[in-house]
A protein has these predicted regions:
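Short, flexible helix-adjacent loops and helix caps
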Residues: 8, 32-36, 58, 83-84, ...
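Alpha-helical solenoid scaffolds that mediate protein-protein interactions
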Residues: 3, 27, 46, 53-56, ...
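Acidic/polar residues at beta-strand termini and the immediately following turn/coil
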Residues: 1, 8, 55-59, 105
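Loop-centered beta-sheet repeat module
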Residues: 1-25
C-alpha cells in the first residue's frame, strides 16, 4: 500500500515501473534455460510489478497514453510467455490497447514517436498471442510442440 500511495503522488514512478516490467519480460525472453533460478526470480519481480501496475488506485490516475500502450505490451508479452495467466490478464491488456487505438482513431492530432512505438509493440504482441493460441487449437491445445 505504501508503494501504491507513492505511485499515486508521483506519476513518473508509474511510468518507470512500466518500463521496468518491460525490461524484465524482454530479458526473460532472451534468457537461456540453464539460468532457471534467475529466470524464476525475474518472473517474481515481473509479477509483482504487474500487480502494482494494475492496482486500481495506481492505474486510475494515469493519463499518459504512451504508458497505457506500453503496459498493454508488457502484459500481453507476459501472457504469451506464460509468465502471467492469459485467462486472467489478457482481457485487461486488450482493453488498454483498444483504448489506445480508439484515441488514435478519434483524435485528429499528431502523435509522437514514443506513443506510436508503444502502440505498435502492444499490437504486435496481441497478434503474436493470437497466433500462439490459434496454433494451440489446431494442435489439440498444445502450444509448444
Amino acid at each position: 500500500d505504501k508503494i501504491i500511495k507513492k505511485i499515486e503522488l508521483d506519476k513518473s514512478l508509474y511510468e518507470n515501473l512500466v518500463y521496468y516490467a518491460a525490461s524484465l519480460i524482454d530479458t526473460m525472453e532472451l534468457m537461456a534455460q540453464p539460468l532457471y533460478e534467475i529466470y524464476r526470480k525475474l518472473q517474481e519481480y515481473y509479477k509483482a510489478a504487474v500487480t502494482l501496475l494494475l492496482s486500481s488506485k495506481a492505474q486510475e490516475n494515469v493519463q499518459d497514453k504512451t504508458v497505457e500502450a506500453m503496459l498493454s505490451y508488457v502484459i500481453l508479452k507476459g501472457c504469451r510467455m506464460k509468465a502471467l495467466q492469459t485467462e486472467k490478464y489478457e482481457s485487461v491488456a486488450v482493453d488498454l490497447l483498444e483504448k489506445v487505438f480508439h484515441s488514435i482513431n478519434t483524435q485528429n492530432q499528431t502523435f509522437d514517436a514514443k506513443y506510436v512505438a508503444a502502440a505498435a509493440f502492444g499490437y504486435s504482441e496481441w497478434i503474436r498471442n493470437r497466433e500462439y493460441q490459434d496454433y494451440g487449437i489446431n494442435k489439440g491445445g498444445v502450444l509448444w510442440s
